Structures are given as C-alpha cells and as structure tokens.
Amino acid sequence: PVCMAHPGTLPVINKQAVHHVLRVGTALGSDLADFTEFDRKNYFYPDIPKGYQISQYKYPLVSNGMLNGVAIERVHLEEDTASSSHEGSEGSLVDYNRAGVPLMELVTKPVIHTAEEAGAFARELQLLLRTLGVSDANMEKGEMRVEANISISKTDKLGTKVEVKNLNSFRSVERAIAYEVERMTKILDGGPGEIVQETRGWDEGGQKTFSQRKKESAHDYRYFPDPDLPKLKISEIPEFANDVLKATMPELPWEKRARLVREYGVKPENAE
C-alpha cells in the first residue's frame, strides 16, 4: 500500500479532497492558491512506516482567512497517519486502517488566548464542515481531531511551545489546554520540572497530559517536493475556479444567524 511506499505503489492526488479544501477556503474568505505542490515530511515514528508523510509545506492550497474571530494561517492537504493506542503497560498498538487517507489540516494563527475560545472555535469549525458537506466531523469517530499548541510566558519573549495531539472531544480540548496552562504556570513560578518543546497526549481517565515524544522544528523534517506527485495549476481545472466555488456555497452558519436576527427578530443568543 501507499502508506508503506512499496515499489510500484505510487500515490495519486485525490481530486475530491482538493475540492473540499478549496471550498473550505472559499467559506473562510481565504486566499486560494493557483499553484500548489506536495512535499515529503521526513520523520521516524511507528505511525508512518515509510519514514515520511505526504504533506504541503511551501505552497498550501489555502492561506489566510477568518473563522469565529480567529485568524487562519493556512489550510493544506496531507495523508493521515496510523492511529496509536497506548493503553496498558506492555506496549502500544498501531492501527493502519486510516493511514494514507486524505486529511485536511487547518492551522490558526497564535491568537487564541483561553481554553474556552479554543472550544468555541472548534465547535464553529465542526458546524462549518458539516454545512459544507465536506465531512461529518464526528470527533468520537476520529473524523475531526484537534491538536492544541500551547505556549505561555511571563515576558514579551515567546515561551516554549507544547503540542497536545489528537484531542477527540470539545471537552478534552478545553480541559487539556487548561491543564497545560496550569502545569506551565507552576513551572514558570519556580515549581519543579522544565518546559520543553514536545508532543504530549491527553489521559482522559487521569485528566492530565503526558509526554509522548520531543517535538521537532520545521527544519528537522527536511521537507522537499514529493517527486511522485505532480504540481497542480488550480486555474487549469474548471471546477476549481473561484466563481464556480462561490456559486456552490450554501448558506453559511454566520449568514443564517444574521438572517434569523434580521428577518425574524430572533435574539442573537438564541440564533446561536
């Protein structure tokens, strides 16, 4: 299979997945790329057996945009990795059923300040994805996952970033962020421990995060264009044209709320 990079099993770009990403970008008021390419993100971990992940680095499909008052950095397409289960003490289990499946990744700018803001953003994103019909976005089924990057500092100097991966409910998103903020605050106030750039998981039973692995920087991934996938010229694909994408937009959640308030006199809090 493609996720193993066996000879003769070349990857193919999923046209429908590209279309979904562009529709999300259109709804967000983003800048849609005319040229895009796919890159190899090189790292070693059991969830990616071929040693690299097909992703987008320099030329994402979508840049900028806004959702629920939160600025968007980019939306790109990549392949999903295997899922890992760390229950029990004898070892970990790896499930490759989803490996290689198209995955849309949306990255926000660092403008979310509280766990509650993060939860509200995730809920609005889920509603948007369902409205557009690009995903059922059921978090309990792994169709939508949140990875929270958390950093706090007592000064103007940026703090060390910690990523909590694969949060699969809005409650776990808010609780994991709140836990990390409290943990980091205690360390910065002189408590035991050290804040290092790492990937952490969320223990639902213990209601705490735990270290999984040290987090690499972008240059450590040694991105380079994937030679097995062609570059894309978006303007050469008729159904990806801006006017076509806009014409297929349904009534978006914030538009529906505004219409309920304007035409029917519904209170804004009830329209939500």
Enumerate the language-model features and the residues they cover.
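Long, charged low-complexity interaction segments
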Residues: N242-E272
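Basic, nucleic-acid-interacting segments
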Residues: P1-M249, P268
